[in-house]
UniProtKB/Swiss-Prot annotation:
This is 2-C-methyl-D-erythritol 2,4-cyclodiphosphate synthase. HAMAP family: IspF (MF_00107). Keywords: Isoprene biosynthesis, Lyase, Metal-binding. The lineage of its organism: Bacteria, Pseudomonadati, Chlorobiota, Chlorobiia, Chlorobiales. The keyword Lyase applies. Belongs to the IspF family. GO terms for biological process: isopentenyl diphosphate biosynthetic process, methylerythritol 4-phosphate pathway; terpenoid biosynthetic process. Its cofactor is a divalent metal cation. Pathway: Isoprenoid biosynthesis; isopentenyl diphosphate biosynthesis via DXP pathway; isopentenyl diphosphate from 1-deoxy-D-xylulose 5-phosphate: step 4/6. It is an enzyme of class 4 (lyase). It comes from Chlorobium phaeovibrioides (strain DSM 265 / 1930). The gene is ispF. PANTHER family: 2-C-METHYL-D-ERYTHRITOL 2,4-CYCLODIPHOSPHATE SYNTHASE, CHLOROPLASTIC. Its EC number is 4.6.1.12. Involved in the biosynthesis of isopentenyl diphosphate (IPP) and dimethylallyl diphosphate (DMAPP), two major building blocks of isoprenoid compounds. Catalyzes the conversion of 4-diphosphocytidyl-2-C-methyl-D-erythritol 2-phosphate (CDP-ME2P) to 2-C-methyl-D-erythritol 2,4-cyclodiphosphate (ME-CPP) with a corresponding release of cytidine 5-monophosphate (CMP).
């Protein structure tokens, strides 16, 4: 059994969609990045890759590659799940925390959990997604960006 942790941060940018946990959330601005900038799925991907000692998201999906420009991060997470399976691992659980001031994501959490579970081919009750604000402190509090932290447990299949 192994534990992994993943952290990701993206700044907000006008004119981009806000995609979090594979869900398109109504917002006047979205997260900026080479892919769809799904901060939650990136943190989950890094946690899983780290637990399996398979590097990180930047190694597998470099932001210098045109192949990954604007790619749906659910595709990336599915690839991570298959990579773990190929290396003899299975996901036991995922626990993730989203840090952003606005918009509120409570109405979208169930869909985020389902999306992560579907990508990893696990049951939804093995995935937890929570959110908190930064109490108006720092770049998150000023609504300049968002962050996500994720931990996971994997075990040999």
């Amino acid at each position: 059994m192994r534990i992994g942790i993943g952290i990701d941060v993206h700044s907000f940018k006008e004119g981009r969609k806000l995609i979090v946990g594979g869900v398109d959330i109504p917002s006047p601005k979205g997260l900026d990045g080479h892919s769809d900038a799904d901060v939650l799925l990136h943190a989950v991907s890094d946690a899983l890759l780290g637990a399996a000692a398979l590097g990180d998201i930047g190694l597998h999906f470099p932001d210098t590659s045109p192949e990954f420009k604007d790619i749906d991060s659910m595709i990336l997470l599915k690839h991570v799940g298959k990579l773990l399976e190929k290396n003899g691992w299975r996901t036991v659980n995922v626990d993730a925390m989203l840090l952003l001031e606005a918009p509120k994501i409570a109405p979208f959490v169930v869909d985020m959990r389902k999306n992560i579970a579907r990508c990893l081919q696990i049951e939804t009750d093995l995935v937890s997604v929570k959110a908190t604000t930064n109490e108006k402190l720092g770049y998150i509090g000023r609504e300049e960006g968002a962050a996500a932290h994720a931990v996971c447990i994997i075990e040999k299949a």
